[in-house]
Curated annotation (Swiss-Prot):
Gene name as annotated: ureG
Gene Ontology cellular component list: cytoplasm
Entry similarity comment: Belongs to the SIMIBI class G3E GTPase family. UreG subfamily.
One Pfam family matching this protein: cobW
Residues of the signal peptide: none
Keyword Nucleotide-binding: yes
Coiled coil: none
Organism: Rhodobacter capsulatus
UniProt GO molecular function: GTP binding; GTPase activity; nickel cation binding
UniProt entry tagged with the keyword Isomerase: no
Protein name, entry field: Urease accessory protein UreG
Localisation: Cytoplasm
Length: 208
């Protein structure tokens, strides 16, 4: 674990549901923990602005960084821009317990540097096709938690949900996963429980 607040990296391809997950986690945890968010976009701060519009956290607890080029570089090879944003948030809010770091959309090979994230969540999209879990990739196989999002779309895109979960189980082995519909809140309780358990947040998140 890094020093200071727990850092959770949220990765996945474009459109998989990373910002939706970030928003839902803020809604679920902001009343129980002191938390903040860092978003990564290639040339804009659109994801940060979306979170501000949703008012899931005060604006001064959200930082948007523009990575330029390949978004995976800013979360793996050279995480300095994200580390600077984290340092800024920690100075502004010394009581921080949790920081969510949302990566820019990338491919199945994107991973977070251990210098940047204590835990990683990887989000994939059911609508991207039946074979996504079978394609493996570090995001699918090595993340601390895999979230298979938009399972409600399976019948509309020719995906067999039973086979999708079986393939996910094979790809993950002993590592946990959640079948989710993030926009509708399905699976959020399981993801929150994972963060509390694996991130050592039990006492901090206990109801007052």
């Amino acid at each position: 674990m890094t020093n200071g607040p727990l850092r959770v990296g949220i990765g996945g391809p474009v459109g998989a549901g990373k910002t939706t997950l970030t928003e839902q986690l803020c809604r679920a945890l902001a009343g129980r923990l002191s938390m903040a968010v860092v978003t990564n976009d290639i040339y804009t701060r659109e994801d940060a602005e979306a979170l501000m519009r949703a008012q899931v956290l005060p604006a001064d607890r959200i930082r948007g960084v523009e990575t330029g080029g390949c978004p995976h570089t800013a979360i793996r090879e050279d995480a300095s821009i994200n580390l600077a944003a984290i340092a800024d948030l920690t100075r502004a809010h010394p009581d921080l317990e949790l920081i969510l770091i949302e990566s820019g959309g990338d491919n199945l090979a994107a991973t977070f540097s251990p210098e940047l994230a204590d835990l990683t969540i990887y989000v994939i999209d059911t609508a991207a096709g039946q074979d996504i879990p079978r394609k493996r990739g570090p995001g699918v196989t090595r993340s601390d938690l895999l979230v298979v999002n938009k399972t409600d779309l399976a019948p509309h895109v020719g995906v067999d949900p039973v086979l999708l979960e079986a393939d996910t189980q094979r790809a993950r082995g002993p590592r946990p996963y959640v079948m989710a519909q993030l926009r509708h809140g399905v699976g959020i309780d399981e993801i929150v429980a994972f963060l509390i358990r694996e991130g050592g947040l039990e006492q901090a998140s206990a109801p007052a």
